Curated annotation (Swiss-Prot):
Residues given in the record as heme binding sites: C450
Gene: SBE2
Keywords: Endoplasmic reticulum, Heme, Iron, Membrane, Metal-binding, Oxidoreductase, Signal-anchor, Transmembrane, Transmembrane helix
Official protein name in the record: Sarpagan bridge enzyme 2
Signal peptide: none
Function: Monooxygenase involved in the biosynthesis of ajmaline-type monoterpenoid indole alkaloids (MIAs) natural products, important plant-derived pharmaceuticals used in the therapy of heart disorders. Converts by cyclization the strictosidine-derived geissoschizine to the sarpagan alkaloid polyneuridine aldehyde, precursor of vomilenine, an intermediate chemical in the biosynthesis of ajmaline. Converts by aromatization the tetrahydro-beta-carboline alkaloids tetrahydroalstonine and ajmalicine to the corresponding beta-carboline alkaloids alstonine and serpentine, respectively.
Family: Belongs to the cytochrome P450 family.
Amino acid sequence: MEIMNFSLNSPVFLLLSFFFLLMVLMQLTGSRKYKGKRLPPGPKKLPIIGNLHQMVGSLPHRVLKNLADQYGPVMHLQIGELSAIVISSADKAKEVLNTHGILVADRPQTTVAKIMLYNSLGATFAPYGDYLKQLRQIYALELLSPKTVRSFWTIMEDELSTMVTSVKAEAGQPIVLHDRMLTYLYATLCRATVGSVCNGRETLIMAAKETSALSAAIRIEDLFPSVKILPVVSGLRTRLTNLLKQLDTVLEDIIGEREKKMFSSNNIQPSTEEEDMLGVLLLYKNGKGKDTKFRITNNDIKAIIFELILAGTLSSSAIVEWCMSEMIKNPRVMKKAQDEVRQVLKDKKKVSGSDLAKLEYVKMVIKESVRLHPPAPLLFPREVREDFEMDGMIIPKKSWVIINYWAVGIDPKIWDDAERFEPERFSNSPIDFYGSHFELIPFGAGRRICPGILFGTTNVELLLASFLYHFDWKLPGGMKPEELDMNELFGAGCIRENPLCLIPSISVAGN
């Protein structure tokens, strides 16, 4: 059988030969770069690809945990060109993110982020410095402050009512929860970022879904960044560039329309109709923000809006889906959570933001779920800014630092019966997931902790409470709880391999 039909002097062969020789050269150069440095221990590296073969085709967080069991909580891997330091314990994560926090405050610059976030603008991928500090301050004090999140309760409750009505219409029929949640989350995020009147919402959602899909795998283009031709040959650059053109057209129109409306009559504040994140950002663009010295551009605004829509959807839906999965497998927990919600709400027509503080057991369910099923088992990587020493070992500049939070979440040294779903372990416990307790950091910690934790967890609590209040749930086809698979699919986050399909019945207590 003919496998390759090109001659030895064909362009394809010459290109592959050049690529191979280049890889060998980089391997030799990379080996010399670390010569004489005591790196953390790790498995043997193959020429050119390093440890890449150990990551392909498996769930990376599980592979890395197994390797850490052998090589320790601070481990060195070579993944293509990239030097990676993998941290697999709570105390070492605290040491890296707190003690050496300033030295690991950068993010690696991925191909997707560079193109879709306007050269890595926004709070997630921007290099550490004055721009990022000022931007995170705007997030904390204005865009995602507790006061602002409370102001979005009306939007959340409105979109929840729409979702609940759609589920009620299909009571008794199997539904895929993931789809319903994404519809709610995209609608809520679009309204919170750019307002209720938004031409091009479908394009925003399409671009977010496409970008998430393209971020859902280890990309060869990012593992061999010095080979500039890879994004071109793979077609990734063309695909992203075309997607960005569609996104950019919509966002420019939205920004232009709003800016004209806000400032054409010498207005200095958004009207009531315009109280969303875009209105706040436009004040900063026009020198009318709280910090009048900090100015931003249209590209900053577009990156921030798109980043918020991206970050606020898949992680929240994944958390709720895993919560529901665990409660279906543990009927005792489901009943206890439903009883709490229905007791707190009593005869109310719907769940509201003001009810959430009283739902103590529901919060325990969420904590336990993100412990076992974190939305990002491997926290967003950090990039080392300068060499530093840790336990007598050198953590080299430009290395990626990867926190395997999933390994921390099931560490038997921290958690009793670590792999069991037991929300009561958080009863009367001070542990929260806001970055101070390193045994529970699903949203990161330190200088790059997720700035949208409150907004995201509010959506999660509202979704989960609504499902528990309005409906009773069972598996389709007479399936028993213990038969539900809990297989994972690793991508931009960690979701169920098979989306959760349940049959809702309308609860008398919640209606």
